[in-house]
Amino acid sequence: MYDSTSKIKDLSLAPFGKLQMEISETEMPGLMTIREEYEKLKPLKGAKITGCLHMTIETALLMETLQKLGAKLRWCSCNIYSTLDYAAAAVSTLENVSVFAWRGETLEEYWWCVEKALTWGENGEGPDLIVDDGADASYLVHKGAEYEKLYEEKKILPDPETGKNEEERCFLSLIKSSILKNPKKWTNMSKKIIGMSEETTTGVLRVKKIEKNNGLLFTAINVNDSVTKQKYDNIYGCRHSLPDGLMRATDFMISGKIVVICGYGDVGKGCASAMKGLGARVYVTEVDPICAIQAVMEGFNVVTLEEIVEKGDFFVTCTGNVDIIKLEHLLKMKNNAVVGNIGHFDDEIQIADLFSHEGIEIENVKPQVDRVTLPNGNKIIVLAQGRLLNLACATGHPAFVMSFSFCNQVFAQLELWENRNTGKYEKNKSYILPKELDEKVAYYHLKKLNATLTELDDNQCEFLGVSKNGPFKSEAYRY
């Protein structure tokens, strides 16, 4: 039954969304197995979960799984362009599920949606748990509480005009407005949140930064660093969705072209592999000597951006850092060069500086594709204004690989909820899931691919010092 408090684009899209969910179920064997094992037990009964994660069909199936396990949900997307409106419509019809997401939100609307997903009552009551992607929901709670303390002690309100970009100004404006309405909302909310589980590399960096400064207000489980997330979603997911996004956006031939991949972490590895497989000449930029030598050993040229910027046909950032492709680089690119980002946030490329630069002409070609005429007359193609091109220009990672990631999210939520009173997890620390669960997630997906495990005999188990049922590797093993 549709929750009238939801805010979505078009409820009439729900039947199509439900059909897509039904089709994708067969491609998400892990989530379906979790449902079979846990649905009758309702282990999440009573849990209020806020989600801030791309509102796709795969996410809809994650939400439905959490709901079937007993949870109540309030959900928003973590990117203004990544929502599939038919997915939002379909999942909003589930009992005890509210959705605040639509494709093409403004930044002001985006943060409104995040606040709505976090707010469970008229007096500002919050969730028990958070499913996060990029840590935006958790960040809002932390910064809100921080500014409330400043207001309580010194009567200083956040000044939106001090924001370094439009998004930060919207963010500060929301917190200012919130404090004037309820000066203890985020502080009170943070005290009741049991914990959060974080999906991405970028979000983990954000959480670690808060933790390092002794500012973590509730437990965090780092889902990204589970092997069955990091090595599958980040590598194989990007290997599938990057070329999908590039081809849908441009229809340009990739074979024979020069593709520059900025960053050779797990995401970069998947991107470079995909481009190589399509016949591109791949160049990699890196700061880490370990990642750089890995790229060279795979046959890629490792260069600086300055060396290749005037020659590249496609540029893709995937570093999790800021200001990777600067304005000075953009202005030097050749005619019809394509620029996009597959890292979580939009500040890897200085798009705002480009769009406001004197002499620039911007022409929208189609949704999330802009052609920018540079002062020298060259035209470059900018994808998704520097946001996630695989989700903005296509539909993101395939369902099968997301089944791995979302199994880890479900297990993280179960761990937090079931151990809320045991003391297993400290409130101001971050954790990763135990290896037993990592192996369990992998095991769930073997049957779908007709793979059969070899079983160790007793002598082999004794020699290795492991159980027949695992875990089979030490915590230090890097796969």
Swiss-Prot record:
Residues that bind NAD(+): 200-202, 234, 263-268, 286, 321, 342-344, 390
Which SUPFAM superfamilies does the annotation name? Formate/glycerate dehydrogenase catalytic domain-like, NAD(P)-binding Rossmann-fold domains
Q: Name one GO cellular component term.
A: cytosol
Q: Write out the catalysed reaction.
A: S-adenosyl-L-homocysteine + H2O = L-homocysteine + adenosine
What EC number(s) are associated with this protein in UniProt? 3.13.2.1
Q: Which free-text remark accompanies the cofactor?
A: Binds 1 NAD(+) per subunit.
GO biological process entries: one-carbon metabolic process; S-adenosylmethionine cycle
For the keyword Transmembrane, the answer is no
Pfam families from the UniProt entry: AdoHcyase, AdoHcyase_NAD
Give the keywords, sorted. Hydrolase, NAD, One-carbon metabolism
The residues listed in the UniProt record as binding substrate, with positions renumbered to this chain, are 56, 133, 199, 229, 233
Source organism superkingdom: Eukaryota
Swiss-Prot/TrEMBL cofactor(s): NAD(+)
Q: Briefly state the protein's biological role.
A: Adenosylhomocysteine is a competitive inhibitor of S-adenosyl-L-methionine-dependent methyl transferase reactions; therefore adenosylhomocysteinase may play a key role in the control of methylations via regulation of the intracellular concentration of adenosylhomocysteine.
**Family per UniProt?**
Belongs to the adenosylhomocysteinase family.
Q: What is this protein called?
A: Adenosylhomocysteinase
Q: Which organism was this protein described from?
A: Plasmodium chabaudi chabaudi
